A protein has these predicted regions:
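Short Pro/Gly-enriched beta-strand edge/turn motifs at strand-loop
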Residues: 40-48
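Short beta-strand elements
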Residues: 58-68
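Catalytic-loop motifs flanking and including active-site residues across diverse enzymes
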Residues: 88-93
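C-terminal binding/interaction regions
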Residues: 106-156
Length: 156
């Protein structure tokens, strides 16, 4: 069984079949779709984490919505990106919003980061090592924060 949620596994599989130049073109195409991942006006979120970190060139906001009941709760991410965010971060945002959509919190937390070089290629991982993992790290942090807040409310 794949360690990746099915939608992310399909994206990884697509990239693995592409030569390097087509991988870059496909990454640019995903980056162009990043605006579709932005938070929707008048939609409420269970967790919002907007900040500027050292690892990224601009502010990134992670918006987490959890639907359903335990143990089948599903996560839905929206991400706001500042205007200075790099193309690779935009591409990873789009890939992760699509690839992790409707996964369980637990599945998101278990996603190994080894899919990143399979998508972007080894060269870009070396050159942009912080950038390519940044959005995944933030999404996992949002899931952990949601679970911690939920535990505190249950124990409080």
């Amino acid at each position: 069984m794949s360690a990746y949620p099915p939608k992310l596994a399909a994206i990884v599989s697509l990239f693995e079949g592409l030569p390097e130049d087509e991988k870059r073109e496909t990454l640019i195409s995903y980056a162009d779709q990043a605006a579709r991942c932005a938070p929707v006006e008048n939609e409420s979120y269970d967790l919002e984490d907007v900040r500027k970190d050292e690892e990224c060139t601009d502010t990134v906001g992670i918006f987490l919505k959890v639907t359903g009941a335990n143990p089948c709760r599903q996560v839905h991410f929206r991400v706001s990106l500042g205007p200075q965010v790099q193309i690779l971060t935009k591409a990873m945002t789009s890939i992760l919003c699509k690839g992790l959509d409707s996964s369980t919190i637990e599945k998101v937390l278990e996603v190994p980061a080894d899919f990143v070089p399979r998508i972007v290629g080894g060269q870009l991982v070396r050159v942009r090592s912080q950038t390519v993992y940044y959005v995944l790290t933030r999404m996992k942090s949002a899931c952990r924060a949601f679970l911690n807040r939920e535990r505190s409310a249950a124990n409080g």
